[in-house]
Amino acid sequence: MFKINIIHQISKKIPTSLWVFFLFAIISLLIQSSEIFEKGFVLGYDSVFHMNRFYDTMMQIKTGNYSYFISLFGFQQSARVINAVYDLGMAYFMGFILLLAGSWLKFQLITSFLVNVIGAFGVYRIAKKCDLNIYLSFLIGCIYMTSTLTMSWNLNGSFNGIGNMVLPYVLYYGIEMMTNKKNKFSIVGLGLSMGILLQTHFFSSLLVTIALSPFIIITFISCKEKLIFVLNLFFSVSLSILSSLNVWLSLFHITKNNIIIQTAPRDLMRNAVFFQ
């Protein structure tokens, strides 16, 4: 009885969010259990492309031979410009995880676990911000974890899953600016989360910008202190640009100085079907 009381007292001191995070971790391990026990790497349609990217950054970290633009180790050492225009920040983070993991199987298990848990917890925070109870919020997080939005990384090696891991943390501040009585939101939170998303998956940052637009417009119309709201938004945008400045400079530099061939030359009209 004494031991039960001690456990009960300890459990009360642990924050609810930590318990939720722990439960998400257990569910993620259950989802990944077949891969853990079978010890088999899941090779998706995008896996080889990203494996080359991360192997390149991993070897750069390991050897100390860094190259911002060209691929020194990946893509058959072809000197292709990939990571500089494809989310360089996350590429180096993934390369670091690969270096620590030591194998592709461990790398996939670790990254899939992080995508599942972090993404689910982000959606849980949004649900709680919308005043849903803890059980419903947890359920929504579980649904998000098992949806194609995050599972696309686990099963297909698609980087959309990585972007969808970060996306809820940006969208959270759209909810915050609408639900707050004075229409206040965390300037640093919105700016840094968007900056991290820009370093993670550029297309996801475009999607979340579109998703945030209605929140911004409605909040601007309804708020009384419009100038303060616009200034706060300006500071957040500035912070997100500064925290992802390398992304913008890379795109500008390559686009401006590329005189040999277009980055991705495609004649879309040649494969189109015309009806007369």
Give the residues covered by each predicted segment.
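Structural signal for the C-terminal ends of transmembrane alpha-helices
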Residues: 30-34, 173-180, 214-225
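Alpha-helical transmembrane spans of integral membrane proteins, capturing the lipid-embedded, hydrophobic core
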Residues: 21-29, 113, 117, 141, ...
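Perimembrane helix-loop-helix junctions
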Residues: 207-239
